[in-house]
Swiss-Prot record:
Reaction catalysis annotation: 5,6-dihydrouracil + NADP(+) = uracil + NADPH + H(+); 5,6-dihydrothymine + NADP(+) = thymine + NADPH + H(+)
Activity regulation field: Inactivated by 5-iodouracil.
Domain 4Fe-4S ferredoxin-type: start-end pairs: 69-100, 944-976, 978-1007
Protein name: Dihydropyrimidine dehydrogenase [NADP(+)]
Organism: Sus scrofa
Assembly mode: Homodimer.
Annotated [4Fe-4S] cluster 2 binding sites: 91, 130, 136, 156
Record gene name: DPYD
Entry's family note: Belongs to the dihydropyrimidine dehydrogenase family.
Name of the top EC class for this enzyme: oxidoreductase
Disulfide-linked positions: none
Entry's localization field: Cytoplasm
Required cofactor names: FAD; FMN; [4Fe-4S] cluster
Task performed by this protein: Involved in pyrimidine base degradation. Catalyzes the reduction of uracil and thymine.
Active site: residue positions: 671 (proton acceptor)
Amino acid sequence: MAPVLSKDVADIESILALNPRTQSHAALHSTLAKKLDKKHWKRNPDKNCFHCEKLENNFGDIKHTTLGERGALREAMRCLKCADAPCQKSCPTHLDIKSFITSISNKNYYGAAKMIFSDNPLGLTCGMVCPTSDLCVGGCNLYATEEGSINIGGLQQFASEVFKAMNIPQIRNPCLPSQEKMPEAYSAKIALLGAGPASISCASFLARLGYSDITIFEKQEYVGGLSTSEIPQFRLPYDVVNFEIELMKDLGVKIICGKSLSENEITLNTLKEEGYKAAFIGIGLPEPKTDDIFQGLTQDQGFYTSKDFLPLVAKSSKAGMCACHSPLPSIRGAVIVLGAGDTAFDCATSALRCGARRVFLVFRKGFVNIRAVPEEVELAKEEKCEFLPFLSPRKVIVKGGRIVAVQFVRTEQDETGKWNEDEDQIVHLKADVVISAFGSVLRDPKVKEALSPIKFNRWDLPEVDPETMQTSEPWVFAGGDIVGMANTTVESVNDGKQASWYIHKYIQAQYGASVSAKPELPLFYTPVDLVDISVEMAGLKFINPFGLASAAPTTSSSMIRRAFEAGWGFALTKTFSLDKDIVTNVSPRIVRGTTSGPMYGPGQSSFLNIELISEKTAAYWCQSVTELKADFPDNIVIASIMCSYNKNDWMELSRKAEASGADALELNLSCPHGMGERGMGLACGQDPELVRNICRWVRQAVQIPFFAKLTPNVTDIVSIARAAKEGGADGVTATNTVSGLMGLKADGTPWPAVGAGKRTTYGGVSGTAIRPIALRAVTTIARALPGFPILATGGIDSAESGLQFLHSGASVLQVCSAVQNQDFTVIQDYCTGLKALLYLKSIEELQGWDGQSPGTESHQKGKPVPRIAELMGKKLPNFGPYLEQRKKIIAEEKMRLKEQNAAFPPLERKPFIPKKPIPAIKDVIGKALQYLGTFGELSNIEQVVAVIDEEMCINCGKCYMTCNDSGYQAIQFDPETHLPTVTDTCTGCTLCLSVCPIIDCIRMVSRTTPYEPKRGLPLAVNPVC
């Protein structure tokens, strides 16, 4: 009996065991069975689990905000990029958050980092440790929606880390004269005391302003201040602090360690005697606040202050912090941490990593009074730290030379808000170690004497003007913890930033110079910003290849003016006609597309419009062109014009446009709706003969270049382009919108629906949804007509997509829908993005990157994961009992490494230097054409197969399902571990990779065995019917 071909064989049926099936009955499972199921598949901590994960010597990232590229792109796309964004107003350094998130969503990580470091020289540090819930995130408008605020800190960290991996140095503002030609004032000696965040920020901005003799004096043998010594490695790795310090040193800032404030080393008076024109005090608050009951207690007895404990932990866990490598403090048994601020929580979680069995956070007030940010509180809670509120320490009990307990009294708040201690309510808490984290002060009389003659306030802190950061001594400024206004790293950074401008203003005044009334601090610059992205096409010089298409963003000439002010290289006017062809639009006429599904807000992949050409007169546009060219001579203005198939009309209108001063013309032969009914637009652009003749008429009429705007709504766009060239056109625009009907409502009415009759017409679809059509059009024209100039349009929404069109053969790029999604300022992102893409092509060390995307290391939730299979020879997923096994293996590995006590390798930073020329725009035009051809030219010998990285796999089974129901049933799915395995029947179709939600979890690699297609039946078998 012949086999039944339309039934799966037994092997395939086995593979399909877990494939989804439509449900025909309600499910029935016992509660006990479901409890067991839940335990097996659980990924988050079990609420009934009371055992603590072994964290000793585990200093891996624990932040919830950390993002990998996938998470960053999804989160950035979710951002609304609001007008007058509240997130920016809530940031102490006033980061342009909207702009840097825009860059991330466009995969321009360099551009995002440039925006971040321009306003915050410690942008990576702050991305990691900022209490964003109380700052930028607290003002996010998406807080008013179901999905909640954007993870701004995680996005800031991600972009900054990618830039860090690029290893590109900071440079002086390119607009500054060389150092030798700078005015004398810029050689003034400036001293900064303390190498913490405030000083690093202040020095960075002063160096960006052009000052060349800046020295930071630091009493420790390491730099970074509290970022280095008190914020733990698992929240802020030392290589991050070092990276930002190296960026500062790129500008020539000097650091001298081992120099403290004292009569015998550094004083303000000695600095003045040595010729320093200005000084900045950023020494923080170096001494701990302690309760009298701890007087005389030592570390050997089990007592630490946060100022003792955290630096000890840092020195043993932060690679590169100092030359020494000391062991972790040996903390055993129960630990009491006193305090409710961020430092107390850092002490608590650090104690677990030093071996503490249990940690109790004890504080005087209630939970609602905890000063630590919610992010830190939640982390301590997850790590099973215990919280004991309303307790004030009264007595430390010592036996045998060791702390054994602490006695507390209860605190209560009365009706007036005053806190009282109730001596009748006593709590006796056993402990082996006590860590006091009650805050910091400036107490050392030697330091105060060295700061003489500045005045101190009643809190024993320097008197400082909160606007200028100037002390009572005009040449001395201060910022950070020492001032008493900054409570966070980012506020200290802003103090230094604020002070830098007023130090600049002060020094310039000393040399008889003035500064602008409005502060103008320079941006962050690197060699990327020096890349030339200008391009020539048809004899026209474009300052950059990005321009506005003839569409909604150029509705009026004042909009074009604003676009040029923002940085756009060129613009087309909205298409205009002779007065006899003037139009009046309908409404509604521009609507969101359905190609993104039910996604609302910006980031739409398509729009549909039934808008006609400009409602403004030719006279308006001609006068506007004249005005724009007068004020923006370096920008290209192209007049977009449209007539019916009438020689006199085309010659008249083109001559008017030329006379207005337009650099070039665009002949709109492709408007897909409305105008075609009038014998214009599409009615002219679908016939090669009509196109050829119109171009001949215009060529007879004008001397300036002109370009025919082509429609994609034809069978053969090359024949239209060839006709335009034969008619004398200097190039073509490819392409206009695609004709379509976007959608119908449930009652059958269309959207947009005009008037009471709810009528509509086929409109023009634009946006990234039509990019594949536009890319095909550009490449086919470029291949058929080599060297023929092409202005690309159709789904260009980033530097990356723009580069695709340049590689396809276009010379310049027109943008519309991306501006409709956002605003004119996206041009800044496009320019920095394109510069970065070109620059990175010259760095040999980054040749494995895909544009600005680095290779993806194995990770879960954006954090690197150890390859468990290499440690134990077995693959384990990240859930249920397998997750517990993983944690145990990792804990054992961390202890093994601790016992080895290997010295940390030194941190060395050698910025990558271009080893080959940075390509110009002309060098990349048409680069992709060599890879395009017919299907017959493709090799069916060189095949690929899928490989899945089990460490990155999140066990969703999407690869398995698509392979089953849309492919070749070549993936097995383990019923217990949900780990997919690719079988040798994989044909390399790549569907699995296409639906996998994790970037680079699936890769296609070369097939090592010959590919033999499954024919179903042997060849040459007679057909059944």
